Amino acid sequence: MAEFATIARPYAKALFGLAQEKSQIESWLGGLEKLAAVVQEGKVASLIDRPETNASEKADILIDLVGLKDKELKNFVIVLAGQKRLSILPEVYAQYQDLTLSFNHIKSAVIYSAYPLTDKQVGELAQMLNKRFDSELKISVEIEPELIGGIKVEVGDQVLDLSVRGKLSALYTTMTN
């Protein structure tokens, strides 16, 4: 996926720049989210990969499936289809979303937990993490049973590992060195 990220970056930046000019950042985020979801559906993904379907047909099908009304977003889909890049739409969406968060001075955080967290626990963690990272955070929670217990938090390239697995790994490293 690193290759997709590299390919998607200039598209996401260009689209975001245009969205800023047109004051359409949030509405285009919603459109991109729908496009990214549709492209990942099995039947649509196989249609995109089909060489016998021309680029304009692929673009039209996607535009119709999502119900895009915005002229610039339609043109964006047409450009991607013409360059055989429709499969990178999920990565374009992810990077556009990151640009939107950064523009709004919000960071994205992922809390990994061995067990499901209650809304109250997530709220308390959010307060602590907002202070710790001195920023407003958009938090998502993912369950990873292999953590054994505790949590691991990723904010950008920073990782805060408070899991049992992380502590056992640190103990193992200490004992073997």
From Swiss-Prot:
Subcellular location: Cell inner membrane
Broad class of the protein's primary localization: membrane
Membrane-protein topology: Peripheral membrane protein
Keyword Ion transport carried by entry: yes
Record key words, sorted: ATP synthesis, Cell inner membrane, Cell membrane, CF(1), Hydrogen ion transport, Ion transport, Membrane, Transport
A GO cellular component entry from the record: proton-transporting ATP synthase complex
UniProt xrefs under InterPro entries: ATP_synth_OSCP/delta_N_sf (IPR026015), ATPase_OSCP/d_CS (IPR020781), ATPase_OSCP/dsu (IPR000711)
Gene3D superfamilies, sorted: N-terminal domain of the delta subunit of the F1F0-ATP synthase (1.10.520.20)
Pfam families noted in UniProt: OSCP
GO molecular function: proton-transporting ATP synthase activity, rotational mechanism
Subunit structure: F-type ATPases have 2 components, F(1) - the catalytic core - and F(0) - the membrane proton channel. F(1) has five subunits: alpha(3), beta(3), gamma(1), delta(1), epsilon(1). F(0) has three main subunits: a(1), b(2) and c(10-14). The alpha and beta chains form an alternating ring which encloses part of the gamma chain. F(1) is attached to F(0) by a central stalk formed by the gamma and epsilon chains, while a peripheral stalk is formed by the delta and b chains.
Function: F(1)F(0) ATP synthase produces ATP from ADP in the presence of a proton or sodium gradient. F-type ATPases consist of two structural domains, F(1) containing the extramembraneous catalytic core and F(0) containing the membrane proton channel, linked together by a central stalk and a peripheral stalk. During catalysis, ATP synthesis in the catalytic domain of F(1) is coupled via a rotary mechanism of the central stalk subunits to proton translocation. This protein is part of the stalk that links CF(0) to CF(1). It either transmits conformational changes from CF(0) to CF(1) or is implicated in proton conduction.
NCBIfam families associated with the record: ATP_synt_delta (TIGR01145), PRK05758.2-2 (NF004402)
Family (UniProt): Belongs to the ATPase delta chain family.
PANTHER family given in the database record: ATP SYNTHASE DELTA CHAIN
Protein's name according to its UniProt entry: ATP synthase subunit delta
Gene from which this protein is expressed: atpH
